[in-house]
Amino acid sequence: MSSERRPELEETAVDPATGSAASRKFSIVQDAVETTIVAPTNHGPSPRFSTLVRNLFEPLVNLSAVVAALRKKPTEAKAHIASQFIKGWVEEVGKDIYPAFRLILPDKDRERAVYGLKEKALGRLWVKVLNLAKDSPDAKALSEWKQGGNESAGNFSKRCYEVLSKRTSLTDYGHMTVDEVNERLDLLADGETDQAKQIEILTYFYKHMNATELKWLVNIILRQMKMNATEKVFFEPWHPDAESLFNVTASLKRVCWELTDPTKRLTSAEAQVSLFACFMPQIAAFPKYSGQDIAGKHFKGRPFYIEEKIDGERMQMHMSEYGNKFHWWSRRSKDFTETYGNSLDDASGSLTKRLRGIINPKVRNCVLDGEMVAYDPATKKIIPFGTLRTANRNEQNDLNLTKPMFMVFDILLLNDKPLVDYTLAERKRTLRTIFARTDNETVGQEGVLEVLPYTEATTAAEIETCMRKIIAESSEGLVIKDPTSVYRVNTRDDSWLKMKPEYMSEFGEKLDVVIIGGYYGSGKRGSILSSYLCGLRADGSDQFWSFFKVGGGLTAGDYQAIRTKTEGKWKRWDKNDKPKNVLLAGPNGDLERPDVWIEPSDSVVVEVKAASVVASDQYKVGLCLRFPRFRALRLDKTWEDGLTISQFAELRQTVEMEAENKELELEDRKRRNAGPGRGAKRLKLANVSSDEDELGTDERPTSVFKATSFAVLSDMSSPRYMSKAAVENLIKKHGGTVFQTVEGPHTIPVADTRTIKVQALTKRVHGVDVIRPNWLLDCINEEKLVALEPRNLLESSAETLALAKTNVDEFGDSYTRPLTYKEMQEVLRFMDQFDLDQTNPPDLMMEVLETNDGAVPKGMLFYGKKVYMSTSNMDTVALETQFRAYDALRCLQFGGANLVTDMKDLVVAVAKTEEEAKELRRVSSEQVFPFRVVSIKWVEESWKNGTVEIEDDYPL
């Protein structure tokens, strides 16, 4: 096979209506030599579309029956089905299998334009085709396709089948051929914006296909075949080099038309990345290890490269003839040449005209791999990916507008020489030589085309240092690469690993928990359990309390193993007949209720890890795991080996102590690095105690709580976190008695959050006073029982609250004890606001006073969330920003936010300006657990929408 046929340049127009010769050939060009590739000629007529449905699609979906009949493994059964179909096609139709492959692998077909139809739009079209009333059950079934308890929930094509099978006039398969279906689909793609044309085409399909055929037609239009088979299943029986050619050309047509003889193999040159042939790029895998283990276990002390993970669009650049020809493709093989330019002289392109003089004049041709980003010339920063489309449209002569910039991290071809088999280290060295400007730190030209910098490292500490740097710069994450690896097209393996900040702060222990419930998924998982409810065992009992849901990290093999072990043991959740051994949260015991549940004794133990543990009223334990990930199925353990509530509490205390030790080590490093005389001096105020005093950490026992009984009902969240067990130990250390339940009127309930126990207590005992743990710290610091203040009350009677208010002035300043430094800052801040409030009463304050009929009152919108927002240097910002900042601060206060001045254990910081945001990100990067930095708009949008918005959506 001639090497001249490698790179595809352009294809002649296709006329699906006439089937003219123009659709039977296309040209490829290399070094000015044009070769025309002609489609093979079939000797038989186009078969019916039903042939694909009956002989391929349905057998692959109902694989278990085929496996049983053939007595083969599932992978062998898939290969058998595909090879038999291909063999039959070649014998009965001919060697041009492209018409069939377009329908079998619609997501790989670059020749057909997009339909512009997803599930929602397609559902509306079917409603019109079937002439359904909008409020009819079937119309609702199509629009609400993810809902319902039947098998079709989450599977749009199955939902369409249920609706269409009631109405279609055809009970047997239709007579439409493969060619006819392709022609109509081409027309549907051409009529992307013409709804009348779309309805006409779908109506034709409806009249000429039965419900099963229509189900598969829907999958083809959505380009989601849902038949549990990748392109490899079909490529292997077609030609031994089919996958290799597709990986370096991304062309289904070339695979079908060039590889018609399985005995003729590709040369090594033809299987290489080549000019103007879109290849499938290598992508980074998720790590199996933590940062510590990546350095130690994965690389075993060998060097590795650390790159910043760029927030952009993966792009490959092909250049030839010293810049006279360019071609650009995305990761999904979408052609962006018209957008970015086809030559250095292309005035309409948004990038190539700016590349003149950047690429070394000795470079005749090259293929580069990188990330296309949006660049702001004013700030000289890369800005969020969502702005890239706007940057592409901006007028290039306006220097103040955002523009696309190409961040290059790999080179795969240089002056006709493929480099994919060279090591990454060799490719990196080559990459630096192809750009004319290498006289400063930036290789390439800033704002136009740059080579992505990298750091060579060998230790986990270097990974953590880089991670903290990208947190400070509000970047996306890191990519860690093996410098000895070759480039592997269309591969995701551990030679490239991607890490995000969340992966760095895992809850340090593996947890063995029991699955107690399951949830059905959507899409591919519509008919199977895609996530599981896990629980902790109540000590000395066979009851399990709900703890968290997990779905991440499970492979197809894991799902299958769990299904095998639990088959036939699942039961539908019945709110009127709840299980005795599976307990959920909520007054009615139905929060986070699963679709199905299982007796713990019939279930399995799974090993999970998570980013952190957070308080949650949604789960019976009162806590849940943040970002849990499945690690392993523990078939060596039974339900009795599952983690108990008390075991988890002990484990959590150990983890917290390790985190505190790590923080102390970090502080020691900072002090050592600061040098003598560099530490900031502490200001001591009259009637103000230190922050250390506030924490009540004095090791000297006292008898301050002698003859006093407490029942601790939750962890302490402010002024710092302390577990329930730690609070109980603190009480005992200072002479108090601890009960696990409220034993009569002389037992003081203590809690910082409204857990299930607190809610049950307030329902059972009207007007009960629930004291916050900060009162315990006040008493220990003063070495006596101090008067209650409003800040000490979680729940109270009107009388207790009125009495507590008499112990502070109108600004919250205590009459009975010295304030801590933090409290004094809060009082001063409130006093400043008090004068402003008298003259400019904001609408938001009045809004808080109104009755809220939503699920979450605005008075609790930010409840429990630790937020930092400074009002210093307000006179240096614009007047409008000042008003917005004060309004945002009031929203946080009235919404129950825990406003703090210390960055320790912070969750989110609100910045007024970009300069402040930059400084906050720097501080965040130095914390053991980094916090999020958001703009004022995060507060405004959360308040307006009545829900706390995702912080990552509001950067500054």
Curated annotation (Swiss-Prot):
Purpose: DNA ligase involved in DNA non-homologous end joining (NHEJ); required for double-strand break (DSB) repair.
Family as reported in the entry's similarity comment: Belongs to the ATP-dependent DNA ligase family.
Database matches in Gene3D superfamilies: BRCT domain (3.40.50.10190), DNA ligase, ATP-dependent, N-terminal domain (1.10.3260.10), DNA ligase/mRNA capping enzyme (3.30.470.30), Nucleic acid-binding proteins (2.40.50.140)
GO molecular function, one term: DNA ligase (ATP) activity
Binding site for ATP: 307, 309-310, 314, 371, 409, 476, 481, 498, 500
UniProt keyword 4Fe-4S, yes or no: no
E.C. designation(s): 6.5.1.1
Location of the protein in the cell: Nucleus
Residue stretches making up the BRCT domain: 700-793, 857-956
Disordered, as annotated region: 666-700
Protein name: DNA ligase 4
InterPro entries registered for this protein in UniProt: Adenylation_DNA_ligase_IV, BRCT_dom, BRCT_dom_sf, DNA_ligase_ATP-dep, DNA_ligase_ATP-dep_C, DNA_ligase_ATP-dep_cent, DNA_ligase_ATP-dep_N, DNA_ligase_N_sf
UniProt KW keywords: ATP-binding, DNA damage, DNA recombination, DNA repair, Ligase, Magnesium, Metal-binding, Nucleotide-binding, Nucleus, Repeat
Claim: Transit peptide is one of the keywords in the record: no
Organism: Yarrowia lipolytica (strain CLIB 122 / E 150) (Yeast)
Biological classification of the source: Eukaryota, Fungi, Dikarya, Ascomycota, Saccharomycotina
Reactions listed under catalytic activity: ATP + (deoxyribonucleotide)n-3'-hydroxyl + 5'-phospho-(deoxyribonucleotide)m = (deoxyribonucleotide)n+m + AMP + diphosphate
Gene Ontology biological process: DNA biosynthetic process; DNA recombination; double-strand break repair via classical nonhomologous end joining; double-strand break repair via nonhomologous end joining; nucleotide-excision repair, DNA gap filling
Catalytic EC class: ligase
Cofactor(s) the protein requires to work: Mg(2+)
Residue numbers binding Mg(2+) 1: 371
Binding-site positions, Mg(2+) 2: 476
Gene Ontology CC: chromatin; DNA ligase IV complex; nucleolus
CDD domains: Adenylation_DNA_ligase_IV, BRCT_DNA_ligase_IV_rpt1, OBF_DNA_ligase_IV
Active site residues of this protein: 309 (n6-amp-lysine intermediate)
